[in-house]
Every structure is written in structure tokens, then in C-alpha cells.
């Protein structure tokens, strides 16, 4: 589940679709997300994804909360960065494959190391996505 918009904003549709796909086709399900689904839905949604989602890929973007706010401009303001980290950490309890991503060339090598440290600390994998025009 990915595309234009945050998939967890239509959580009921996401869960129903994932359940149907799992039951009918037994295909792996991946969600690409900004990691703010629990803020969007005003509750911890991660346990609801257990058994429905095989991989969740969270856009980390940067290891720095201030830079994250500048880039993402979330309507949830300053609590967004910590909420995204907490969401991802919670995912490691319920979802088999948890990945956080940044895009190559958009941050420094030092920042990439800091992103790796965040992922190591919370139990997620770190992936640097290629920059594509």
C-alpha cells in the first residue's frame, strides 16, 4: 500500500483489503508510510496490523527532529518526529519486517550513520533508497 497520500488515513479500507488479499491470494503485504498513522487515527494502530502486514517501510527522511519538521511539515507539529520513531518501534513487536528509509544524496554520510543508529536502537532495518529523477 503506497502512492499519493498516507495509506493509514484509510485504515479500515487498508485492513479490509489486506485481509482479503491474505485470505484469497496469500500474498505478502507491504505498507509504505510516513509513520504517523497512530497520530492520524488518534490511537495505537500497530496491533491492528499484526497478521495483515508483512513489511512496513517508514520514511525516516533525516535523523534530526528539527530538519524532519522542516521537510515534512506535518499538521501534528513537533510531536511528529518522536511519534514516527515510536510508531516504528511499536511495529517491531507486531510486523515481521520493519524498515526505515532515507533517500540517497538528500542527507550527509554522517546523517546516514545517525539514521542507522536510530534503526539499530529500535530494532528496524535501515535502507537508503536511490534518488530517481
Report each predicted region and the residues it spans.
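Hydrophobic anchor at the beta1->P-loop junction of P-loop NTPases
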Residues: 1
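Conserved AdoMet/S-adenosylmethionine-binding subsite of the radical SAM
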Residues: 4-133
Amino acid at each position: 500500500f503506497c502512492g499519493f497520500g498516507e495509506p493509514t488515513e484509510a485504515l479500515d479500507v487498508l485492513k479490509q483489503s489486506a485481509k482479503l488479499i491474505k485470505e484469497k491470494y496469500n500474498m505478502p503485504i507491504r505498507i509504505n508510510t510516513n509513520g504517523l498513522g497512530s497520530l492520524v487515527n488518534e490511537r495505537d494502530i500497530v496491533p491492528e496490523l499484526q497478521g495483515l502486514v508483512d513489511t512496513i517501510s517508514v520514511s525516516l527522511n533525516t535523523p534530526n527532529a528539527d530538519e524532519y519538521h522542516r521537510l515534512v511539515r506535518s499538521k501534528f507539529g513537533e510531536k511528529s518526529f518522536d511519534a514516527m520513531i515510536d510508531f516504528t518501534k511499536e511495529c517491531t513487536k507486531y510486523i515481521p519486517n520493519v524498515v526505515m528509509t532515507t533517500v540517497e544524496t538528500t542527507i550527509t554520510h554522517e546523517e546516514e550513520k545517525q539514521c542507522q543508529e536510530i534503526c539499530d536502537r529500535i530494532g528496524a532495518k535501515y535502507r537508503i533508497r536511490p534518488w530517481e529523477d
